[in-house]
């Protein structure tokens, strides 16, 4: 059994695509786009390359808030290109939060939920607002709100089950569960999450992290 597992692991490693191959291929396509004056395509390729470089490194890494914001901007830019006039977004981050630290890609599943689920029943007019400000001296207040379809009380209760009884989580809530699971692992009882949602009005998720780390160096480097 151990030998079969070892062979399977080797096969899996052999099947993986080297990230440098992807980066080099994207760069090649980008140069072709520029040679043909396809500036929009070049911009999209640049954003996609940045997303890939950011996401393939250690997901448990601590980064500066400003790096996480830049990643979210690129992600939302590509989603806007994909969905056209579906939504607009606004990010309000207090300047003094830029050099506070957060675990990378912690917010992405919540932003993705707003795009893919919150706006599932509309074709235009969606709005996403992300607010980041201090909570105490080193803590963070993070708010992700949308004006999408919203959720009923039963669905909200199901999400809170992920918080208080993670062993009972539903596979349909895997994105939210992953956020909660990581918050528990990184911050323990130093965080709080609130869900405010109403059918036809939208959803607001608030995360408050107390006593976060402050840094003046980008630890993603």
Residue ranges: model-predicted function:
Residues 1-196, 202-206:
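Two-component histidine phosphotransfer core
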Residues 195-221:
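C-terminal end segment of the histidine kinase catalytic
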